[in-house]
């Protein structure tokens, strides 16, 4: 393998890895803070991709249209997520009824999927890249597509923003404290319900952002729901439930490994995430080191 080929696969793998991270980060954040495994994450990702096709179609395949999709779609999804948390999930926290949470998020995924089919039909849609992002750069003899570079940079910025929010702000401090003792925070006058709503909305927004970013990479179809949900769960389990650092490392590692496997054996490439997860679980176990030390308490 030449050095240029190595770089080609590395760039492609990093791009894939950060796309995986967007969907997994939202899933992991909601689990780590709220203790809710959001089975609607794949549907949210799919919805983000479809909404991106609408925004870009109305604004033209321009840089401005793509930037508007990046800005508008996650916000719309986050607002819808906030409403879903208030109306559906909030009542389940006190009893920590995981079965009810599973059923509610699963029902939400069916609702989103049904809405997408109703609005867009079942045919495939495509998102054209703006001319400014459709070509590539030559880097040490390798080809780096501009859009891949944008995805990588955006992924780094989003990861940094998540860490800054969690560890550099009062909201992040309260969020982490709510995991340890929600009741105590409530006694101290913190509106924990509002905090949880914000976390869930942020997680939904991240998932929708993943759909927007991934939309130009291929056809946008209803199959995106499963295509996004399964890898996101694999990343979360591989990195450790509730461990945001682990999710980032797992997503990027899986993306890079899958890229190199694709070069050698395209038929085996889809098995890469499962193989990596299996090896990691055998070596480490399923828990890993959590971003947040304990699961949400049942009280408060």
List the model feature ranges, each with a label.
Residues 27-49, 66, 95-100, 171, ...:
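Short, non-helical or kinked segments that cap or interrupt transmembrane helices
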Residues 2-12, 166-170, 196-236, 258-271:
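Inter-helical junctions in multi-pass inner-membrane proteins, predominant
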């Amino acid at each position: 393998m030449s050095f240029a080929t190595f770089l080609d696969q590395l760039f492609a793998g990093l791009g894939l890895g950060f796309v995986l991270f967007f969907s997994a980060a939202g899933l992991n954040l909601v689990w780590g803070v709220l203790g809710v495994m959001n089975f609607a994450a794949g549907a949210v990702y799919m919805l983000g991709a479809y909404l991106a096709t609408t925004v870009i179609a109305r604004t033209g395949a321009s840089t401005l249209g793509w930037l508007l999709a990046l800005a508008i779609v996650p916000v719309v999804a986050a607002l819808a997520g906030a409403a879903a948390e208030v109306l559906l999930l909030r009542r389940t926290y006190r009893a920590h009824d995981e079965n009810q949470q599973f059923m509610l998020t699963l029902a939400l995924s069916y609702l989103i999927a049904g809405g997408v089919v109703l609005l867009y039909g079942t045919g495939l849609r495509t998102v054209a890249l703006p001319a400014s992002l459709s070509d590539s750069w030559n880097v040490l003899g390798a080809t780096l597509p501009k859009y891949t570079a944008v995805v990588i940079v955006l992924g780094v910025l989003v990861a940094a923003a998540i860490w800054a929010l969690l560890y550099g702000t009062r909201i992040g401090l309260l969020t982490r404290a709510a995991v340890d003792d929600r009741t105590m925070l409530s006694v101290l006058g913190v509106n924990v319900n509002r905090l949880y709503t914000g976390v869930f909305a942020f997680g939904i927004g991240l998932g929708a952002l993943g759909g927007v970013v991934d939309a130009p990479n291929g056809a946008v179809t209803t199959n995106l729901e499963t295509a996004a949900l399964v890898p996101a769960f694999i990343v979360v389990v591989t990195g450790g439930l509730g461990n945001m650092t682990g999710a980032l490392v797992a997503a990027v590692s899986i993306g890079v490994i899958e890229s190199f496997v694709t070069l050698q054996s395209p038929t085996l490439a889809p098995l890469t995430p499962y193989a990596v997860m299996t090896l990691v679980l055998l070596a480490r176990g399923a828990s890993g080191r959590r971003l947040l030390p304990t699961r949400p308490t049942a009280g408060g």
